[in-house]
């Protein structure tokens, strides 16, 4: 039970937030502090169990290993920073702040479960727990754009969930097992003369599973929801979807495909080719469609699709050469680098848009002259997302490119490099508007100390992970070595 203490603490904190909300009539800012206190306790519980030997729990449904612990810390940290960035923004909700923070915590619980699951049934349940919380959070503004985004996300999410379930059912029908380890054992004990890649139902199950998970990470061609949902959602939730939800989807993606579908190699290379094609489409489409955007949240929505493509490059490297650790390490490092870079960008946008009243890129004209701190922070984030040294985004792309080359995917590395150049067009357009244009009016950006602290922490992380990444790389290497099934 001690090993599940972080999840228990998060669940109790969500309940306490809802109960406390009933007794607060004026300022509800304390709900954010209560949520942060619970997240701090969950983080401490995770660290205390960090060196515990890996084990399976609840009949092999959950893995308590280094991989799960790494994502626990990552998701808890990201959720804490999102809550800090929400303190000012949630004044728009007034009566529903308790529900807002509780749903953020429940989404966190679902994402932690996604990284820990080793069973097809709990995999689906954890996905839906996080998904249901996000469906509500997306529509929290209750205006036309927010409601439209929530409905679109709900309907397309339902279709994706149906495809995922169908895929998991086909995998179960082939193996007769729901536990990932048992499915792997079944595949390994098949007659030596049997070509598993010729089993149409099983391959279809893998394709449908990729489809369902592809929706969760906004990978092409399952990305249709992302730009509209990102634009219409409350900005902190756009941030949460962009970083934490995407990371959770890839955490599940890697555990499932690395632990089950990398043996035999022919099967591994089969799905790796599919992933490589999706990566190519995602990088190209996301970057090209981001160029003409005038709304910065929508632009970052297309950018997020492109970054999902970069992460799929690492996943393709895992599939093509599963014996190499570089693919797994580069995938996790990219998730962290993208998360902290996107955090800086969106936290800056929350502060700026609250003062200007607009998310349109032209409203950022001359921002460097009126608010140099926030302009510098947003510039830092955009440079990191582009892949400029010595920032975290540069090393992340370097590791991705290196993993692709070592996995004999040179063509995919070239595609990724070309797309990196294309992405500079729209990132530098925003930088140009902020630094080279004259301000339309004198607007001072005001923000609370929690938002400033979130901006400072994430900005510092972008610099530290780019200049001295050794500690993070060591944690990631240990986490990927301890994936059990």
Swiss-Prot record:
GO terms for biological process: ATP synthesis coupled electron transport. Keywords: Cell membrane, Membrane, NAD, Quinone, Translocase, Transmembrane, Transmembrane helix, Transport, Ubiquinone. It holds the Pfam family Proton_antipo_M. Its EC number is 7.1.1.-. It is a multi-pass membrane protein. NCBIfam families: NDH_I_N (TIGR01770). Belongs to the complex I subunit 2 family. This is NADH-quinone oxidoreductase subunit N. It comes from Dehalococcoides mccartyi (strain ATCC BAA-2100 / JCM 16839 / KCTC 5957 / BAV1).
